[in-house]
């Protein structure tokens, strides 16, 4: 048999900040940031429920996110203000699978293998205005797009002792996608790169005092 699970989520954020940028008793610079963020996500997976040595799981994940950010900087001593508008929508999908084989070669030893594929597309529509009593002047503008994809594997070994306790070892690849910063001053700070890591974990778990104390070493 099998079971199907679904998880749907929606997030909404409305943030307003006012910051005294000159940090002095005088009114010289004052920054205002207004940001609205909306995100919708859906995850669906199906996994085996039939008793046996082999267990499997397949899943898919998708999301859409929209961020609208406006940063206004008032220059009181110069009688003008700057206004930066950042429109940063993004969407992504992921597909994953995991298989586990129990009692591999010997009773109590299990092997788990997993793999995941991620794809994400993000864009940034940026407008920069200088505002005075005489009106508004556009100083800069761009519309950029970025695409990212990555495959991340996982492998784990676990041995359950006949009495109590277990040993385990896990190797996984971690991934964090790149994208656009929600605000920036320099051109080189407009985007950030993806990050990857390899993670290794070795450990043991064992109960003591008739299961009243559990110890874990890793």
Report residues per predicted region.
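Outer-membrane beta-barrel proteins
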Residues: 1, 19, 25-41, 83-90, ...
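Membrane-embedded beta-barrel scaffold of Gram-negative outer-membrane proteins
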Residues: 3-22, 160, 165-176, 191-218
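Outer-envelope beta-barrel architecture signal
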Residues: 2-4, 44, 52-56, 107-111, ...
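Residue-level signature of outer-membrane beta-barrel architecture
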Residues: 38, 46-49, 99-103, 149, ...
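Flexible, surface-exposed loop regions and adjacent strand-edge segments
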Residues: 11, 20-29, 72-81, 127-137, ...
């Amino acid at each position: 048999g099998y079971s199907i699970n679904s998880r749907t989520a929606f997030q909404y954020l409305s943030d307003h900040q006012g910051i005294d940028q000159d940090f002095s008793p005088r009114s010289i610079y004052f920054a205002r940031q207004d940001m609205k963020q909306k995100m919708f996500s859906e995850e669906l997976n199906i996994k085996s429920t039939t008793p046996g040595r082999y267990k499997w799981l397949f899943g898919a994940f998708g999301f859409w996110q929209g961020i609208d950010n406006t940063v206004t900087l008032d220059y009181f001593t110069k009688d003008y203000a700057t206004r930066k508008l950042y429109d940063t929508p993004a969407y992504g999908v992921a597909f994953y699978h995991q298989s586990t084989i129990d009692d591999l070669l010997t009773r109590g030893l299990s092997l788990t293998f997993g793999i995941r594929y991620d794809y994400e597309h993000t864009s940034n529509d940026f407008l920069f205005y200088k505002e005075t009593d005489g009106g508004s002047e556009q100083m800069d503008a761009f519309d950029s797009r970025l695409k990212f994809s990555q495959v991340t594997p996982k492998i784990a070994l676990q041995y359950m002792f006949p009495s109590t306790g277990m040993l385990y070892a896990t190797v996984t690849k971690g991934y964090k996608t790149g994208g656009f910063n929600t605000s920036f001053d320099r051109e080189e700070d407009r985007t950030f790169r993806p990050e990857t890591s390899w993670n290794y974990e070795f450990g043991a778990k064992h109960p003591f005092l008739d299961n009243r104390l559990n110890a874990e070493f890793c």
